[in-house]
Structures are given as structure tokens and as C-alpha cells.
Amino acid sequence: MGARLTTPVPGHDVDLFDDYCEHLLVRDAQSLQVIGTYRVLTPAQAKRVGGTYSDTEFDLTRLRTLRPRMVELGRSCVHPDHRHGGVIMALWSALADFMVRNELDTMIGCASIPMLHNGVVSGDAAASIWQQVRKTHLAPIEYHVLPRLPLPVEHLAGSIAVDPPALIKGYLRLGARVLGAPAWDPDFNTADLPMLMRLVDLHPRYRKHFLGA
């Protein structure tokens, strides 16, 4: 994606939030290789580090009442050889268990769209995906957030027929909502959509699967 990382470990994605996060891992049963990851920043740890990664990309003022029971998800990654659905479902199951055990009910995060996505370049894909999801999956206005470095969607082609990345589609199927227009992340050269998922909004099919309710 053309990432330009400034980290203490060359070639590795490391930032100041890592040491404050819980890290969910899925390992291959045979090789024990890590094949799936999530990092989770709890409310208590967010206070310790001074905020969330999402705070660096968006003004989250309107989410202040949610923060006491809100975690931030990030760095979701599944090994290319295991992107058949099983690994991400295992991660989501572990995440649901983590939320319930810790009496948390809200998740936020930045869902990334590469500047080059499905052959569409220069942010037109991200602008088009934003125009799609704002019509069907936009959160109530009281939860809207503002990007600190907005993607200039008004100057991009926003009517291209392009599917969102698989992870974003998965979040939307679960019942997640988009909190506003995308920010541009120059370090990773992506457009980042702010997303929110509340357990109360979990689609009934997945509620039964993950929560047994």
C-alpha cells in the first residue's frame, strides 16, 4: 500500500499504543505460526496512554459518553494463506468473549481502504465506497466524528462501482456503523473510515453465534 513507517524496528509496524494494548492471536494448530491478530485498547489503557489511535485521525468529541465502556480495535491482520473466513471468525469470537468478560459494549476503529483498490487509483475507490456506505450504514448524527486530515472526497470520483475491502464488508454485516467521512493516513497511504460497533446492534445471526443470545 506504499506505507512509510517511522518505527523503532525497521520493516515492522510498531507504535506507542502497542505496549498498552491486549493482543489477540490465532495460531495454526500444526505449525503454531501466528496467522491472525487484533490489538485491543481498553478504556483504562486509553486513559494511561492519553487517547486512542483513532483520536489521532479524528475528533472523537461526540463519543465521550461511550468511552467508559468503549475499546478500540486495530491492526487486524490475517495471513494470506488463511483468508477463508475461519481465522477472522475465531478472532471475532475471542473479541466477543473479551468484551463480555470485561463488561464492555462498544468498539471503534479505523477501517482502511488502500489508495489503489481493485484497480481504482487516487482515492476514487475510497470516495465511492464512502458514498455507498453513507446511504445505508451511517451512524446517528450524535455519534458523527470529523477527520483531522480529510480525504478530499468532493474532488474525487465518487460514483465508481467498487466493493469495499472484505474486512469493512464483514463489519457492516455484523451491524457496524460508519461515523463519518474518511481521513487520509499519509503514513500508510490509505483512506480510513471511522467505524463503530455496539454489541446491542449486533446482527441477530451473529449475536447468537458470538454471544449465545
Question: What residue ranges belong to the model's regions?
Answer:
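Short secondary-structure capping/junction motifs at helix and strand boundaries
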Residues: 3-7, 33-37, 105
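Long, continuous compositionally biased terminal/linker segments
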Residues: 194-213
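A short helix-loop-beta-strand connector motif used in the catalytic cores of GNAT acetyltransferases and
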Residues: 15-25, 48, 188-191
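Active-site beta-strand termini and strand-to-loop segments that position acidic
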Residues: 26-29, 197-198
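Extracellular structured ligand-interaction cores
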Residues: 21, 35-37, 70, 192
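Acyl-donor binding region in acyl/amide transferases
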Residues: 43-177, 182-190, 195
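An N-terminal domain-cap segment
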Residues: 1-20
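Conserved beta-strand in the GNAT
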Residues: 25, 32-42
